[in-house]
Design a protein with these regions (language model features):
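An anion-engaging/catalytic patch
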Residues: 1-132
Length: 132
């Protein structure tokens, strides 16, 4: 799915999981994550995680707004092409579940989703207040 991102309809946020900061992209209808954040969380090579994610055939969210992603810190400043994003819950309950299960931390999935939903609600609420 193509995303048309601007600073009005998207917002980056970070959550701390296992002492590591994970960056998420909040959009109106979803909470998105890219495979590099899962790799960071489990100290895995990004390519290894990306391959596992690609095999899962999750719906990709892609954007051409490279400048905004770099401003958000969601993209390496030297990168030319942005990574695709995926729905957070589908990522955690799908390809990332393997890593959580391996470390016997599957209960963390629910915690991450709840914290992310809280961040999303706060962003939507604050955004709506700003419009008034």
């Amino acid at each position: 799915m193509k995303l048309i991102l601007d600073s009005e309809n998207s917002h980056p946020t970070t959550i701390t999981v296992k002492g590591k900061e994970i960056t998420l992209l909040l959009i109106e209808s979803s909470i998105l994550i890219d495979s590099s954040q899962i790799a960071k969380l489990f100290d895995k090579k990004e390519k290894t995680v990306a391959t596992k994610v690609q095999k899962s055939k999750l719906e990709k969210y892609e954007t051409e707004n490279i400048k905004l992603l770099k401003n958000y810190g969601l993209m390496n400043p030297d990168a030319v092409k942005p990574r695709p994003f995926y729905d957070l819950r589908l990522m955690l309950e799908g390809p990332a579940y393997y890593y959580f299960k391996k470390e016997d931390e599957t209960d963390l999935i629910d915690v991450i989703v709840r914290v992310a939903i809280g961040k999303h609600r706060e962003w939507v609420h604050n955004k709506n207040i700003d419009k008034i």
